[in-house]
Swiss-Prot record:
This is IAA acetyltransferase. Its EC number is 2.3.1.-. Keywords: Acyltransferase, Transferase. The keyword Oxidoreductase does not apply. It is an enzyme of class 2 (transferase). Pfam families: Acetyltransf_1 (PF00583). GO terms for molecular function: acyltransferase activity, transferring groups other than amino-acyl groups. Residues 4-153 form the N-acetyltransferase domain.
Length: 153
């Protein structure tokens, strides 16, 4: 299996921008605009975001981020994505574990997330990693197309 690395990197690199555009198209095909809660590239580059890039043999194949809410004491998992051609190699699990490490290092007490109900594989990964269903949080309201989850750290 090719070497996979996960590291904090800028989301403003060309290959990462292309990956985020692919993710946006994917989510846009699944959900209406009002149910897509996407952080744009400029927001992903802010200091309160820890943006991670997965590379396989040096090529960008996935990403994930944690938005740190210091007031609430939690981190929100954002922009988790692995290219379809790179799936099946535990990259998503490794990204999520690295996000958890970043959250612990930042002194956060929990990770929260919002994901779409049509993403069964992603939901299964979150549950396998210890996330449990919860109600809306932060800026979110009830949405029949959203699932909200939490994992204490």
């Amino acid at each position: 299996m090719p070497n996979v690395t996960i590291a904090r990197e800028s989301p403003l690199q060309d290959a990462v921008v292309q990956l985020i555009e692919e993710l946006d198209r994917y989510l846009g095909d699944l959900y209406p605009a009002e149910s897509n809660h996407l952080l744009d590239l400029q927001t992903l580059a802010k200091p309160d975001i820890r943006f991670l890039v997965a590379r396989r043999s040096g090529t960008v194949v996935g990403c994930g981020a944690i938005a740190i809410d210091t007031e609430g004491g939690y981190g929100e998992v954002k922009r988790m994505f692995v290219q379809p051609t790179a799936r099946g190699g535990q990259i998503g699990r490794r990204l999520l574990e690295r996000i958890e490490d970043e959250a612990r290092a930042a002194g956060l007490s929990a990770l929260l997330l919002e994901t779409g109900v049509y993403q069964a594989t992603r939901i299964a990964l979150y549950r396998k990693q210890g996330f449990a269903d919860r109600g809306p949080f932060g800026p979110y309201g009830p949405d029949p197309l959203s699932l909200f989850m939490e994992k204490p750290l």
